[in-house]
Amino acid sequence: MFQDNPLLAQLKQKIQETLPKKEGTIKASDKGFGFLEVDSKTSYFVPPPYMKKCMHGDKVVAFIRTENEREVAEPSELIEQSLTRFIGRVKLFKGKLNVAPDHPQLKKLSLKAKTKKGLNEADFQEGDWVVAHLVRHPLKGDDGFFVQISHKITDANDKIAPWWVTLAENDLPNSEPAGIDDWQLKDDADLVREDLTALPFVTIDGESTKDMDDALYAQQLPNGDFALTIAIADPTAYITPEDEMDKVARERGFTIYLPGRNIPMLPRDLADELCSLMENQVRPALCCSVTIRKDGVIGDDIRFFAANIKSHARLVYDHVSDWLETGSSEQWQPSEEIAQVVRDLYAFSQARANWRETHAVVFPDRPDYRFELSADNDVVAIHADMRRTANRLVEESMITANICAGKTLQTTFGFGVFNTHAGFKAEKMADVVELMAVNGAPNADAETLATVEGFAALRRWLATQETSYLDNRIRKYQSYSEIGNQPLPHFAMGLDVYATWTSPIRKYGDMINHRLLKAHILGKAPVQTPDETVGEELALHRKHHKIAERNVADWLYARTLADEPAKETRFQAEIFDINRPGMRVRLLENGAMAFIPGALILDNKERIECNGEDGTVLIDKEVVYKLGDVLEIVLTEVNQENRSLVGKPTQVFADLVSETQTSAEQPAEGAENNEPQV
């Protein structure tokens, strides 16, 4: 009877006009209530009845009123809803379609749903994975929440779910682009391709690699220098900037690499066949030749040219590594011609690695963790693959090639697609200088560290320290690597300029650089120039791909390690992050990440302190763990819903003995001599 009473509505409006308003973000609890977080120090309680009008993550304006002598927030206006397009699972209530969002704070919600036009509700079963869109919200004046299902991802128990769901969540494709029936070579009429089919190029890749995009040749000269030629697959020979396939490649940005599978940027018939530098097959290629001095310095005779080449040997990383490291390989016996090419490539790579270790930055070796899957998408094993001699040989070749491209694009055009890194964040430089001064780092003043040479020298000094603690500490002061169209330095690599062009089958930015390098060869204006937005586009693609890769891995780790808490399996783990709630570690055996709450290190808030600023864990004010430490842990929880791992150290910290206890436990004076006590 009071619901539509205009007088009551008028009175309510007048009361609300007198109430203060606050803007903030809703943080939900699993108990029905929530909080309006205004800033890092201010929050207001949101009672359960008011929480029914909003959900976790919503940005809202709320009235602040007093109820039961407590300030509470009543959300009144929606600024930005947390859910728009989202991934969820079907819930059926009395035959009616509902969707539960696949989000840790929202999983308990069950939102009424319908399918979009063209989908049949009967095709959706309990637990099916779907893409949904929130189309009604109470704070928009709607009667409750309501969602529309736009797409079914896969069935409830499909083991492919980790891949398909993660790709859908990040709005990424789950298959290669469609090819065309008849690929045509579209070279510029003035482009001359040199015939290098007689030169004994070799490819070195993984055993199952099909999209072989680089072939190498080196010859050590009588004076000890090296004549190096790098040949790179040439998809821009078939794809022009105006082609529809170019738009597809730009939209994808990169080949997507996920645990156990990849989603190509280009059609497989192009990437794995027509452009792949297969053994004994003539292929168009973009090439770079350069002399590398025996001391590892790159010569000034950098030359880019187009060619037709033929790989004379399709080699495998492990076979080549075995042969170089032990003198033989059971799986591979090279001809003398190929053996000499590999020996010279190896000698060149050592010269370059030595130069980079002395003058630039060499990243520490870390294993690549590889999931081995069954035909049913179950994890059979997780392998920790260390980079071996052949991997480093190829890496040095690619880095050399990309330095050559960077220099050429910088000189010829002053633009291109460059990988850049700005070193330390300007606002953090004072912190870096202070930290390094305390720890005795040489030449670590702000002016020096603002140069590539000074930054690289500090990184080399950090690499000589006994532990990786300072290295880990300093990382949070560094900028992120970027992609841009200006030839800026790459501080993290210790290089003045760096432009990748060695993976055009897998990276759209490399395709752009190929077109620029061809313009350089022809002495013509480029058919494509990188605009201001291309770097941001590619960086965003790369970010989403990395998130997808990590999310699939987390899902597979949760599946694979589900039984380990019950088994109390012990793992060696490295600390890579410490914050106030606890520390994050990486299991060295398989690469899984786990969180260790402070309470599972020592359940006494008075005694333990997790200091994120210093990267240390202290007990009774003594450092017990720090960034980079390796410790033994057991997993205590594997949460399949959230795809997360929780662990605790096997080390047990003793209870603090009070002075009173200590006095009581000490023998009275003379007791050890059995003297009578008076």
Swiss-Prot record:
It is found in: Cytoplasm. The keyword Nuclease applies. Residues 193-521 form the RNB domain. Residues 659-678 are annotated as: Disordered. GO terms for biological process: mRNA catabolic process. GO terms for molecular function: exoribonuclease II activity; RNA binding. This is Exoribonuclease 2. It comes from Vibrio cholerae serotype O1 (strain ATCC 39315 / El Tor Inaba N16961).
